[in-house]
Amino acid sequence: MRKYVLYLALLAGLLTGCYNEEDSREHVLKVYNWADYIGEGVLEDFQQYYKEQTGEEIRIVYQTFDINEIMLTKIEKGHEDFDVVCPSEYIIERMLRKDLLLPIDTVFAHSPNYMNGVAPYIREQIDKLGTPDNPASRYAVCYMWGTAGLLYNRAYVSESDLKSWGCLWDKRFAGKILMKDAYRDAYGMALLYARRRDLAEGRVTVPELMNDYSPASMDSVEKYLKLLKPNVAGWEADFGKEMMTKGKAWMNMTWSGDAQWAIEEARTVGVSWPIPFPKKAATSGMTDG
């Protein structure tokens, strides 16, 4: 699970490609999603719902990914013709610029248009990914929302150690930290720490830094990530929560959904999640659609 569930919606992206299996392509729904994002039984329920609405049967081909950039590369190269995908907001923005998406069909059988019920704030956040003439809400709506922060084991780390992202560079934690293998999260965390004084003095904002890919900023990120290397036990996309529950790592820069899973599974080893992370250290919220 990548993030904590706060909102429910859908992104519909019909991509070009070929389909060579026996089923007629129009009766196959191909979904590309994060692991743990759809509960057991939902796919079967949807097949039944679809038949009730249309009188036709549909087969679902469901695949998962754990890194946004891998998902995007697979789609860009035309290896698959997915109907529904669930990338993070910055990938939605790229896909829209590259004309990889089609507008959501809001007229389906006897179903109401649920997009009319999307909260104005959420629609506004999605539309920021597009342009006034081509708002992203035509192509995407929010499905998951969450943050990145630090999961820690209280047997080895105290909450007072976690005043800022600087704790990740503390030599006491050499070889005991797991980092999320997600480019944007690692990049953003390192840049927020590198520019912490500018943030504190109001010369720059978190959203500005999270989208700053200037040569100077990339150099700063490279410098701080290299300095972090001695403390990193590994880079993980999904196994970090399990290593934390087993006490094999002391800290994990992770997504709030993974952290919540670990808390529920491993209270006996003292895993704790500081929510919210101190404002001066927190990354901006993340949205998957």
Which residues are covered by each model-predicted region?
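Hinge/lid segment of periplasmic solute-binding proteins
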Residues: L72, E93-W145, E159-K163
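A bilobed periplasmic-binding-protein/Venus flytrap-type ligand-binding module shared by bacterial periplasmic
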Residues: G149-Y156, L192, T287-G289
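Short loop->beta-strand "edge-of-pocket" segments that line small-molecule binding or catalytic clefts
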Residues: C167-D185
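C-terminal motif of bacterial Sec signal peptides marking the signal peptidase cleavage site
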Residues: L14-G17
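Short helix-loop capping/hinge motifs at secondary-structure junctions, enriched
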Residues: Y156-K163, R195-G202
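Ligand-binding pocket segment of bilobal, Venus flytrap-like solute-binding proteins
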Residues: M179, A186, A190, D198-P274
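Early extracytoplasmic/lumenal segment of secretory-pathway proteins
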Residues: Y19-K98
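Extracytoplasmic/periplasmic substrate-recognition and gating elements
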Residues: A266-G289
